[in-house]
C-alpha cells in the first residue's frame, strides 16, 4: 500500500523530517555515494530541513525529488523518458514514468522547489576577484541583469487552432551580477498572450517580487534590454519601491534635454562618457541619459535610467554586464541541452525553470570550491583571455585609444565551460560511488 503522510505545521514537519529523512533510502545521497556527490547536493538538503513546504512522502522523498530534478537539468537528456531510461540502465531505481510526470504537476512540490531555489540563489557568495571594490557607490544596491528566455514547447503541448504551431514557453530570469546566482522571476503568461512582453510580466510581478527579499532601505537595480522600458512605471517603482532600471535608448524615441548633470571628468571610471543629461519623456516624467563612446567597438551608445547618483561610466559598464545573462541562457541551451519544456502543465514548466536555476547555482558553488580547495582553474581559457586582451590593447594603442578602466579591472569567466560540465556529469552520474578525478579536470583545464 502506498502511503503519503502530510503534516501541515512547519515545526512539526521539521521535527519529523530530521528524524525520518536520514533513514529514508535516498537514491541520490546514499551512504555509498562519494563525498563529492554528497557535497554537491548538500546545499539543497540543508535548505530542505528548514523549508516550510516539505512533507514526509516515503514513496518519493522531497530530498530525492530535488536531487532528481537537478540531475535532469544537468544530464541534458532529450526527453523525460530518455532520462528515466538512462537512470534504469545506470542501475539507479528511479520513479515510475507516470509518477515522475505526476510529481511535476504537483503544486506542493512546486512551492517547495521554488522555496529552495530562491534560498539557494540568495545564499550564493560573491564571485572572487570582482570589480565592486572599484565602485563603492554600489554598496547600497542589489544589482541584477534581467531578461526573458524562451524555448520549445513540450511534446504534448496543444497546437494553435489557426496556424497549427505550438507556442514557445517563456520565462523571465534575473542574474545577480555579484554572485552570478540565477533566479526565476515568473513564467510568461501562456493563457491570454502568445508571447508576453517583458514589461507586462514585470508589472504583473509587482514591487515585492522584484525586490527579491531585499531589506527595507536597500536599493534594487535591474539592467534590462529595451523591452524593459516604461518611464512612468520606472518613476512609480523608484518612489514606491526603491527599484531602479537601466536600459538603452530606442531609435524612435523623442527625448528633450532639460538639464546637464555634473560628472567628474578626471575619474578614470568615466572614460568614454560623452554626456550626462536629464531628458524629458512623452510620459510626463524625466529620466537620466548617459551618452557613451565605446572605444573597443567604435560605437556611440545612449543609456537611460531612473538612477541619478552613480557615476556615468559605471552606468555604461553596468549595461555592458547585461550580456552575462545572455551567456547564461546560452549555457542552459547549448551546454546543458535544455531546449524544450519537460511537460505541458504550468506547474511543470515553472518547476523546470527553478531546477535549471538550481543546477546553474550548484555548478557555480562546485567550481568555486574546486578552485579554493584544489587550486583547479580553467587555465587554458584564462590564457586565451589574456591573449585576447593583449591583442585588444595593441589594437587600441594603434588607434590612440585605451581600454576603459572598468573593463580592465573587471575580468572573470562568466559561464561554465563545456569541459567542466562534461567532467561533472561523469563524477556525479557515471562514477557516483568514486571520489572525483581532480587530476583529470586539472589536465582538461590546462590543455583543452
Model regions: which residues?
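Basic, amphipathic alpha-helical segments enriched in Lys/Arg and hydrophobic/aromatic residues
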Residues: 343-367
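Short, charged amphipathic recognition helices of the HTH superfamily
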Residues: 74-89
Amino acid at each position: 500500500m502506498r502511503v503519503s503522510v502530510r503534516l501541515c505545521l512547519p515545526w512539526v514537519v521539521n521535527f519529523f523530517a530530521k528524524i525520518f529523512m536520514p533513514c529514508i533510502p535516498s537514491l541520490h545521497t546514499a551512504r555509498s555515494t562519494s563525498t563529492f556527490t554528497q557535497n554537491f547536493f548538500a546545499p539543497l538538503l540543508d535548505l530542505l530541513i528548514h523549508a516550510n513546504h516539505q512533507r514526509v512522502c516515503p514513496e518519493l522523498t522531497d530530498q530525492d525529488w530535488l536531487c532528481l530534478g537537478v540531475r535532469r537539468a544537468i544530464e541534458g537528456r532529450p526527453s523525460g523518458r530518455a532520462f528515466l531510461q538512462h537512470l534504469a540502465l545506470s542501475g539507479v531505481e528511479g520513479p515510475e514514468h507516470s509518477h515522475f510526470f505526476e510529481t511535476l504537476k504537483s503544486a506542493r512540490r512546486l512551492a517547495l522547489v521554488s522555496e529552495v531555489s530562491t534560498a539557494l540563489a540568495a545564499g550564493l557568495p560573491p564571485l572572487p576577484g570582482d570589480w565592486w571594490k572599484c565602485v563603492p557607490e554600489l554598496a547600497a544596491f542589489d544589482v541584477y541583469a534581467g531578461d526573458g528566455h524562451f524555448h520549445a514547447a513540450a511534446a504534448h503541448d496543444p497546437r494553435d487552432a489557426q496556424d497549427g504551431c505550438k507556442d514557445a514557453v517563456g520565462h523571465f530570469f534575473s542574474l545577480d551580477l555579484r554572485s552570478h546566482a540565477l533566479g526565476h522571476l515568473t513564467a510568461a503568461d501562456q493563457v491570454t498572450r502568445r508571447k508576453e512582453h517583458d514589461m507586462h510580466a514585470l508589472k504583473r510581478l509587482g514591487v515585492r517580487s522584484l525586490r527579491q527579499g531585499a531589506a527595507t532601505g536597500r536599493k534594487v537595480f535591474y539592467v534590462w534590454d529595451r523591452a524593459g522600458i516604461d518611464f512612468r512605471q520606472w518613476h512609480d517603482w523608484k518612489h514606491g519601491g526603491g527599484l531602479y532600471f537601466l536600459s538603452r535608448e530606442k531609435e524612435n524615441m523623442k527625448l528633450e534635454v532639460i538639464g546637464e548633470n555634473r560628472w567628474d571628468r578626471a575619474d578614470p571610471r568615466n572614460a568614454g562618457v560623452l554626456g550626462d543629461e536629464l531628458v524629458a519623456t512623452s510620459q510626463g516624467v524625466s529620466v537620466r541619459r548617459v551618452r557613451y563612446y565605446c572605444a573597443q567597438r567604435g560605437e556611440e551608445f545612449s543609456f537611460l535610467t531612473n538612477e541619478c547618483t552613480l557615476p556615468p561610466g559605471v552606468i555604461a559598464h553596468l549595461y555592458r554586464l547585461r550580456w552575462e545573462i545572455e551567456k547564461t541562457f546560452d549555457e542552459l541551451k547549448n551546454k546543458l541541452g535544455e531546449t524544450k519544456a519537460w511537460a505541458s502543465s504550468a506547474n511543470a514548466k515553472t518547476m523546470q525553470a527553478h531546477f535549471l536555476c538550481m543546477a546553474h547555482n550548484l555548478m557555480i558553488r562546485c567550481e568555486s570550491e574546486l578552485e579554493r580547495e584544489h587550486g583547479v582553474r580553467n587555465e587554458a581559457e584564462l590564457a586565451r583571455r589574456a591573449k585576447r586582451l593583449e591583442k585588444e590593447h595593441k589594437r587600441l594603442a594603434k588607434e590612440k585609444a585605451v581600454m576603459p578602466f572598468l573593463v580592465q579591472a573587471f575580468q572573470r569567466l562568466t559561464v561554465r565551460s563545456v569541459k567542466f560540465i562534461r567532467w561533472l556529469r561523469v563524477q556525479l552520474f557515471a562514477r557516483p560511488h568514486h571520489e572525483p578525478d581532480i587530476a583529470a579536470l586539472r589536465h582538461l583545464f590546462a590543455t583543452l
